Every structure is written in C-alpha cells, then in structure tokens.
Amino acid sequence: TEKSNDVELHASFTIGRKGGEVITLTDAEGAVHDRITLPEMKTDISFGRSSEDGGLYCYDPPTPFAANGDGFVGYAAAPSFSAEPGFYDSARDLRIIVPEGTQVFYTLDGSEPTQKSTPYDGETLEITATTVIRARTFAEEMVRPSDTLTGTFFIHADHSLPVVSVTVDPDDLWNPKRGMLTVGKGVNKKEGLPFKNTVYRKVKNSGVKYESYVEMYDDAGKRIVSQGADISLNGDYSLDMPQKSFKFRAKSKYGEKTFKAKLFPDRDYEEYKSFVLRNSGNDCMWTRLQDGFQSRLMDLFGITVAHQAWKPYVVYLNGQYWGHMNLRERVDEYMVAQFEGMDLEDADQLDLLEASSRAKNGSNTEYKAMIKKIKAGNPAKKQEDLQYILDNVDVDNYFWFMGFEMFFGNSDIGNFRIYRLNAPGSKWKWLINDLDYGLWNSGFNSPKSYTKKSGMGQLNYDNTIFRKLLTVPEYKDRYLTIYGEIYRKLTTDTMMEVLDELVELIKPEMERHWTRWGPENDKDVISEVPTTAEGAYKYWQKRVERLRNVIRKRPTRLWDFTKKAFGLSNAEMEKYFGPKPPMPPEAI
C-alpha cells in the first residue's frame, strides 16, 4: 500500500489467513522481481522482507509508510493433549505432546501460560477432578510462543443439561480494580439498586472486553464449539445479581470470526457471531426461566416477530461449577440479519434502535422523522396519512409485537428493539426482548397501560403508531384479530403444559445450582430470598408455583382489562377472544 494525496491505496486482492498463497512482484514487462509464499497470518501481523538482510520476517506491529522494524521468524509449533478434552467417568492420566525444539509451560487456573508458569517435563498428569489445562510452547528468541492450547477435562460431571466451559484469566475476573466479577471497596448496598461504584459495573460501562476460551457441548455430549472469543458482562439492573451474565463474540484474531454450530435446535442457523449466557436477568433468584418460558410460548406461533431462542445450560468457569445459565441469542444487528435471512456480513446495512429510538447500529434519523410525521397526521380521516404509515411500518409485525407484550403484561416494557434494512422501500419492524416481568403479575392492566396518551408503561415509551392505527376501524379490527389469536391459543392449559415441560428440564440441576448460589443470594437485591442451599431451592419451587398461579388467573383478568380498554361489547369480545374464561378454582 502507498499513500498519495492523503489517500491510502490498496492492492485489488486479499490474502487468506491460512497461508500457502504465493505473491509475485513483476514489472510492466512481466519480469519477476520477487516472489514469496505466505505463512499462516495472524490478525494485525504483517509479513515482508527486512531492509537489512533481505530475509522474510513477521512484524508486530505493522509499519505502513515506514521501514519494517525488528521482525521474528514465526511461531512455535503448538502442543497437543494425549487425550481429547471432554467427559470421563473416572480419573484420567494425561500427557502433553511437546513439539521438538520447544519447551511447554502450563496452567490449571485458567491463566495464560508464560515462561513463569509450571514447566512441563514429560510427566503424566493425573486429572482427578474437573480441570481446565492450558499449555503453550516457547522456543528460541526469534520465534514467538504458540497459540495457547485449552481443554477442559470433566471428571464425574453428570448433568441432564448440556454443558459449556468458559476459561478466563482469573485476573480479568477478580482483579480489585478491573475484574468483571469484583464488587470493590466502599460499596454501600443499603443505598438501593443499582449499587453504586461497583467495579463490575464500571467494567461493563467502560465497554472493556476480555479474552476467553469457550468449549460448548450439545445434549449428546458432543463438543460443538471450541475457540477463543471476546467476553464481557451483559445486563443492567441484573448486574447486581450474585451470578452475572456474560456475552461472547467471535473474532478472527482468535482464529474464527463466527461460532460455526447449531446452537439452538429450534433455529435453522448453523453459524453465530455472538451469544449470551444469561443469569435469567431480574429472575435470577426466582424461577430462572421466566423470559425463556415466554419465548417458548411465542415459538408456538411460528416466527411472527423476532425474539430470542432459549436453551438452558450448565456452566463451568475455569473448571469450577458455575451453575445453571440460559443460552440466548445476543440481541444485535447479527441476530436481526439472521432472522431476516441476510448474510452476517451484511448486518451493517441494518438500522437497529433501542425502544427510546437511540441507535445501536446505523441511524435513527429517519425513524424519528417518521414518528414526528405520524404524530402530526390523522390516518382516520386522511388516506395519505394512513398510507404513509403503511409504506413505512410493517403493520402486522408491529401488531404481533404489541399483542404478545399486551398478553404477557410486561410491566417493564422498554427493552425492545426497532429495526429495518437501510434501503429504499424497507419497513420498520419490532423485536421482543427482555420479558423478565412478563406474566409476572396477573393483575397488570397492560391494555390500559399500553394505550394511554402519555405512552406505554411506567416510563411512557412512545406508542404513537399504535394509537394512530387504532383510530382506523380496519386496523383496530386487524390488531384485535391478531391479539385475539394470541389470546385464544395461550390458554391456561397450554401455558401450563409448556411451563411444566421447562420446569422438568431444569429441575434436576436446581438443587446443585442452589447449593452453589443459595449462600450467595443477596437480600440487598431481593430482601425475601433465603441464603441457604435448602432454603433457596424451596424458594425456587415457591416462585415456580407463583408463576403457575399467574397463568391460571391471567386469561380471566385480561379479558376484563381488554374489554374496558378497547371499549368492546360482550359480543365483540366473544368475536375476537371467545367467551370469558372462568377463574380456575385452584387459583390463589
């Protein structure tokens, strides 16, 4: 590359990172002046000739527009294990295979091996408990250390749920100033949520990402992911829960730019850019499936509006049992691209907005202009105002979104997303996210809350489009038809059947989970939570029964709320929603 008139010029071809390609430099007559065969290339490393001896070297950092600096000749060959990482019924003997001319150093605590770590001298390592082993080779001065070999060996790790092992340098977790899981000094929890001045919240808000290694197994115990990835904290108020949520993103600097695996059996995708291991959010110390349960209810309708898949996992962190967590798609432009059938590489073509209309990707300019114009319009009387909405909004998608939120009675609405492809003719769509407070209170009057003039929910999120469309009889009918379809299908019996299935799925893991986390339950977050393993498990059972009681009562109460909020007669209610269901006698 060269620079001319402040413009960087680049060659018209790219090179692969795997190596083996040949680059030839010729003059205009075709005479060859130089030819090199490329080695495997790592991110942000250049390869070229030394101006001193003409030899070929790798350079770190690259030096465009300047002479190459001190180079190195490559990387040491990586070590290997004598047995595959995975699950074993008894203690396991293990050796590390050392490439000729190298020295291996290894760790057992999740840290990156250095030449100050334990040297490996050919001995047999006896693995008697679940352990993460990390090994790395070192060679002569002009050769860089190898990539780190990471493997988790599970001993007597019997689980009914699939397992994921996460390895992170302990300093990135527990460092007193920058550790992701560090509370820090001087935190007064009595001041209320969110806790102020915690190290973990400062780390999350700074946007810092640490290096991790992820080994993920499917239901059959087959390893489907084994690679490095960025790791960072996920969540807002749920950050103050004892167990934190993690988000992971594949990066080419770790070798793979995506996770090439079918992470969710109910999704067709076989490649992901990112995912989340979620602590169940605000439901962390309650049922641990509230949000996922509602995702599964939406699945009963097919994919009508974008929402996250849900799959419960058992997590190990640096070889230590870390309890149950929920695998979720990460809500970002890549998730939306997959849902819309786009290539992941095209995700940057999407405008993705938060509920407040703040842009997460792309721009919010045209969305805000649209809302302003719709507010000023009168679609009930002016066809052009109605047509403007129809030209810019996927109305059915929006009505399904509103119908699900209204049925569930999400009292904490405000964490949804709005998106569209940034291209002529594209329409805005909605994505449902964060239903921790859906089906939480059978008496929450969502029809009234979502249709009020000041906006939806406690924080009055904009509902201009909804209120305007409801003034048009044809579209009020369309919304009530979609909402009624949701209502008729999600009977108490249907919801109970799905809930029972999910409870039975995670129940075998709950006693062990609460043995790990019950003593760390935080009464400054939720005052009533028990802080013993036995008490926490019984409390989990109590919260599940509370959820059952909500879904017993919700259809009956929602029928009345809907009738009043939309001004419907009994005949109209029966047309859209069927007869009012009686309150079940077992409802408390």
Predicted regions and their residues:
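Intrinsically disordered, low-complexity Pro/Gly/Ser/Thr-rich segments with frequent PxxP/GP/PP motifs
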Residues: 1-10
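Conserved beta-structured recognition patch
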Residues: 9-64, 227-239, 507
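Extracellular structured ligand-interaction cores
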Residues: 20-22, 33, 42-44, 91-93, ...
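Residue-level detector of buried hydrophobic side-chain packing
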Residues: 23-25, 47, 106, 135, ...
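Structural motif
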Residues: 27-28, 108, 317
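Short, compositionally stereotyped local motifs that mark structural "simplifiers"
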Residues: 39-211, 217-228, 426, 542, ...
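Middle-to-C-terminal accessory/interaction subdomains
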Residues: 64-71, 162-164, 171-186, 190, ...
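Conserved ATP-binding subdomain of kinase catalytic cores across diverse folds
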Residues: 166, 187-362
